[in-house]
Design a protein with these regions (language model features):
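ATP-binding N-terminal substructure of ATP-dependent carboxylate-amine bond-forming enzymes
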Residues: 1-124, 136-144
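Conserved A3 ("GATE") glycine/threonine-rich loop of ANL adenylate-forming enzymes
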Residues: 114-116, 159-165, 330
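Conserved, charged catalytic cores of large soluble enzymes
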Residues: 169
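Conserved beta3 strand of the protein kinase N-lobe
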Residues: 131-132
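Acidic/histidine-enriched active-site and ligand-binding environments that engage anionic O-linkages
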Residues: 144-155
Length: 380
């Protein structure tokens, strides 16, 4: 089955990125947009763009699904963020007879929070960061764990991601005073529905954040497109990513590939995704999580492999076999440009974009969703 009409349930640069590949394949892109994005470049680029109802937005699953039905979309590409990891939305898309461009909801559910992902890793023989897989609400449990593994330790919301929901504790006094434990004494609503808890892990300092860009088809064929290093972060948000991850010993790289394969096979993962790990120079390697979607930093893997990962996503969603991938060549570095105010400790800021001058030349790639005159709002 050829997917020719793709609704992109997202905005800005990732919507433009997906739309480019859809066009390259000869298909049509359909884009929902909010009032704030009426004049956005992504809205202009899409073959068809439709305003979402007043008061709804990019997380309004029902509005987006109704738009997909009314426009004859064959598939929905969620991009990243918003509804990309919403299991109930993925189920609703499939139940409506529309192709979900991503792993099956069952795989998403198994990997969708940090607690269940740890359980998957353990069952697959992949070592997670030392921690407690059960829900943690008591200070005594944290202190007992720290007595065994040492401080610092990290409390993590099971639905956290993108640097959200992490509380690092460095001593018993901080454990006694942190509000993070009080928050989970009663049922806490999750960011994508349901309720969440938090787990406890050893916070490993001076570790590198390395990951594998993976793909697996419905026939069991698996490949790592490239490794990546995403160690340089601020406030647990990635700022600079490099592919392949430099200075990895051959045995560690082989272990990354094998661990990633085990994780994908454990949940019968079909699609494109990323396995994230911590690595220390002493040889420690621990599993963090699987991101069941495209990531911002997918571009560096594409550049060193000559692979279009969005095209791979669409092929796998069509039921095709994973194509033969080229060996990695060279290195690619991505730098995220953020809208922050240096006079306010680099706090996120808003305003009108008065000028943009992008770099150009051989080997330079720019992924953007902005133009001069655009307003950076607090809404996204």
């Amino acid at each position: 089955m050829s997917l020719d009409r793709i609704l992109i349930a997202n905005r800005s640069e990732i919507a433009m990125r997906v739309a480019r590949t859809v066009a390259d394949r000869g298909g049509k892109s359909i884009l929902p947009y909010t009032a704030e994005d009426l004049t956005a470049p992504a809205t202009a680029l899409a073959d068809e763009a439709y305003a979402l109802p007043a008061g709804s937005g990019y997380t309004d699953a029902q509005a987006i699904l109704e738009l997909a039905k009314s426009t004859g979309a064959q598939a929905i590409h969620p991009g990243y963020g918003f509804l990309a990891e919403n299991v109930e939305f993925a189920k609703a898309v499939i139940e409506a007879g529309i192709t979900w461009i991503g792993p099956a909801p069952e795989a998403m559910e198994a990997l969708g929070d940090k607690m269940s992902a740890r359980q998957v890793a353990e069952s697959a023989g992949v070592d997670p960061v030392p921690g407690i897989t059960d829900a943690v609400t008591e200070a005594s449990v944290v202190k007992e764990f720290a007595a065994r593994y040492g401080y610092p330790v990290a409390l993590k919301r099971t639905d956290g991601g993108g640097g959200r929901g992490i509380t690092v504790l460095y001593n018993d006094d901080e454990v006694d005073t942190t509000p993070a434990l009080d928050e989970f004494q009663t049922a806490t609503p999750g960011t994508a529905g349901g309720t969440v808890t938090q787990i406890l892990e050893k916070f490993i300092t001076h570790a590198r954040h390395v990951e594998t860009q993976c793909a697996r088809d419905a026939f069991g064929n698996f490949a790592v497109v490239s490794t990546r290093d995403c160690t340089l972060q601020r406030r647990n948000q990635k700022l600079l990513e490099e592919a392949p991850a430099p200075f990895l010993p051959a045995d560690i790289e082989q272990k990354l590939v094998e661990n990633s394969r085990r994780l994908f096979e454990a949940v019968n993962y079909v699609g494109v995704g990323t396995c994230e790990f911590l690595y220390t120079d002493e040889g420690g390697l621990w599993f963090l999580e699987v991101n069941p979607r495209l990531q911002v930093e997918h571009c560096v893997s594409e550049e060193v492999s000559g692979t279009d990962l969005v095209d791979i996503q669409l092929r796998l969603a069509e039921g095709q076999r994973l194509p033969q991938l080229e060996p990695v060549q060279g290195h690619s570095i991505e730098l995220r440009i953020t809208c922050e105010d240096p006079s306010r400790a680099l706090a996120p800021t808003t305003g009108t974009i008065t000028g943009v001058h992008w770099p150009a030349g051989h080997g330079v790639r720019v992924e953007s969703g902005i133009a001069v005159g655009d307003e950076v709002t607090p809404f996204f």
